[in-house]
């Protein structure tokens, strides 16, 4: 399997997970005792998860799909992961990864231009 095909498959899985997380956020998490801030964090994570799942589809078509794909996927994990984790667990210990993840997302978009 070539890099473009792998990145495209990962994008599909990521998109499916974003839909599942969005459904949980809309139907399960919303009914919990979460604060408005926790709901906002979860919604932000889900929004960026969706956006960057679509970006992965684009990365599969760029000149260096493996490079762009790895950077975007790492950025998604470091940005969306802590934003999903904190409202679900009330544990902010991973929140320091979010700025690193955001920076990687920017670099990932730029990598698609290479």
From Swiss-Prot:
Belongs to the TMEM256 family. Disulfide bonds: none annotated. Residues 1-25 form the signal peptide. It is found in: Membrane. It comes from the Eukaryota. Residues 86-93 are cytoplasmic. This is Transmembrane protein 256. Its main location: membrane. It is a multi-pass membrane protein. InterPro entries: DUF423. Residues 26-64 are extracellular. It comes from Danio rerio. Keywords: Membrane, Signal, Transmembrane, Transmembrane helix. One of its GO terms (cellular component) is membrane. The chain crosses the membrane at residues 65-85, 94-114.
């Amino acid at each position: 399997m070539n890099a473009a095909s792998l990145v495209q498959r990962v994008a599909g899985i990521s998109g499916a997970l974003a839909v599942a997380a969005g459904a949980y956020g809309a139907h399960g998490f919303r009914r919990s005792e979460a604060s408005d801030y926790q709901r906002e964090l979860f919604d932000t994570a889900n929004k960026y998860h969706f956006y960057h799942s679509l970006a992965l589809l684009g990365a599969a078509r760029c000149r260096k799909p493996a490079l762009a794909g790895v950077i975007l996927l790492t950025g998604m994990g470091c940005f969306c992961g802590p934003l999903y984790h904190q409202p679900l667990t009330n544990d902010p210990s991973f929140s320091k990864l979010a700025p690193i993840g955001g920076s990687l997302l920017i670099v990932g978009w730029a990598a698609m231009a290479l």
